[in-house]
Structures are given as C-alpha cells and as structure tokens.
C-alpha cells in the first residue's frame, strides 16, 4: 500500500483564502480588520523565521499586523507591561509571544498574562481548561490544525485507536484532548513509556511530536494507519525531516503527512483562524 499524502500546504492555503474572504467582507460591511500583535524577544534565528511567516500570513489575509521586536536584554517586567498595554488595546484581537523566551523570563507567567480572549496560541490555562471540559474556544494551533487536516481529507476518526508520541504542553497534551473530542480511544506516550513499539504497532492514527529525526521506524507502523508527523528537524546536510522514517512509513500507511509541507503550514493557518475567531466572538460589538 502506498500512502496518500496529506498536503498541509494546500489545505493551509485554502484556510488562509477563506479567512481573507471573510476579512474582505468585514471591511466591506464597515467593520475593522482583525489585529494581531506579534512579540519577539531576542534574536533566536529559528524564532525569527517563524515570526516572519506569521507576519506574512497576516498581511496576506488583510489583518492589521503589529510587530514588537524586543532586545534580548528585555526584562520580564517590561514584557508583562507590554502585554498589559496590548490587552487594553481595542484594535488588537490576538497577542502572540514567540517562544522560547530568553533566560530569566518565566514562560508560564508571560502566557498567563495574555487575556484569554486574545490568547490566539491557545496556551492560556483558561483555554486549555475549556478544551479539557469539551467546550473549546481558542484552541492550541498545531492540534487544531491537525484536526482540520483530518476533516478536510474526510477521515472518520470515531472509534480509532489514536496514539500520541510526546506529551508536550504545545502539542501532545492538547492533541490528546482534541482526539477525545474526535471520538478516538487515545493513548499518550512519553519518556517513561514501556514498549513504545507495541503502542505504535496498534495505532490506527499515529501522531508523532518529539523533535527527533527518524525516531519512529517505518516497520513499526500498522498496515493502513494514518500517520501525522509533527517533527521538523534539520539534519547536518541541511535536509529537513520529520520524526518518522518517511519512505518506510509511507509504504505501510494509508495516509501520511510529509515534512516539510504537512503539519507546519497548518499551525500558522490556524493562528490566523483563531485571530479572526477572537475578533468575531469576543471583540465585535455583537459578539460580546
């Protein structure tokens, strides 16, 4: 069996086009365009690339994009003060603080300072809690983007045995909640998991997010499984690969996401979706 490729790049472009049309309709109706504030502290090269892609997406869909590039020496108090200012700004619907933050700044404190109705990354405890309680509003971008991919490919998730490799706050944990909502029987594995191969071999839907190139051999994949590879790893030769050995896995799976061009584009597209949602549901006069 040769797997069908889940083309995240194309689906992400569809999502962005849909958002752009809604923004045009808003502006034509006399409503303001959604606003996103992107905050970058320091000069981490990977972070700069991610931030640039988010700003480009904002411009493409017609958002008002505000950039705050702060020096590495920025104190936690200064960053919190900026967030307070943005929380109070009625033209800003979403606040994104690019992680990781420099040493000496508490990630948790910063993320909790963002108003839940402007938390378009979906990391605030309020939004994570709503997801856990089956009443999601602003949902973490990568897990929600993966659900969108499955939906757009008309993949029926109800009753599937889903296995999530990796238990991070950004992907693994919220992904497990999304999969429960999608009707899966869900297992989350982590560094203390015994016999990882056993879990992988029984997965109808496998989502891998550990950040280790080729971590899951293709021979472990169940025949006909759906494989979602969240990993983005750059090898010494410059090649970008996922956490799954792609060619081997693609020979056994029914569907698989490539790296690059799979999950990555969906994370940014979902951020854009979340910002529009925050604008409509929380900040429009009729949404309150």
Curated annotation (Swiss-Prot):
One Gene Ontology term from the biological process aspect of the record: tetrahydrofolate interconversion
Pathway involvement of the protein, from the record: One-carbon metabolism; tetrahydrofolate interconversion
One cellular component (GO) term of this entry: cytosol
One Pfam family recorded for the sequence: THF_DHG_CYH
Keyword tags: Amino-acid biosynthesis, Histidine biosynthesis, Hydrolase, Methionine biosynthesis, Multifunctional enzyme, NADP, One-carbon metabolism, Oxidoreductase, Purine biosynthesis
InterPro entries with a match to the protein in the record: Aminoacid_DH-like_N_sf (IPR046346), NAD(P)-bd_dom_sf (IPR036291), THF_DH/CycHdrlase (IPR000672), THF_DH/CycHdrlase_cat_dom (IPR020630), THF_DH/CycHdrlase_CS (IPR020867), THF_DH/CycHdrlase_NAD-bd_dom (IPR020631)
The organism's place on the tree of life at top rank: Bacteria
UniProt EC number: 1.5.1.5, 3.5.4.9
Catalytically driven reaction(s): (6R)-5,10-methylene-5,6,7,8-tetrahydrofolate + NADP(+) = (6R)-5,10-methenyltetrahydrofolate + NADPH; (6R)-5,10-methenyltetrahydrofolate + H2O = (6R)-10-formyltetrahydrofolate + H(+)
Subunit structure: Homodimer.
Function: Catalyzes the oxidation of 5,10-methylenetetrahydrofolate to 5,10-methenyltetrahydrofolate and then the hydrolysis of 5,10-methenyltetrahydrofolate to 10-formyltetrahydrofolate.
UniProt organism field: Salmonella typhimurium (strain LT2 / SGSC1412 / ATCC 700720)
Binding site for NADP(+): 166-168, 232
Homology family: Belongs to the tetrahydrofolate dehydrogenase/cyclohydrolase family.
GO molecular function: methenyltetrahydrofolate cyclohydrolase activity; methylenetetrahydrofolate dehydrogenase (NADP+) activity
Protein known as: Bifunctional protein FolD
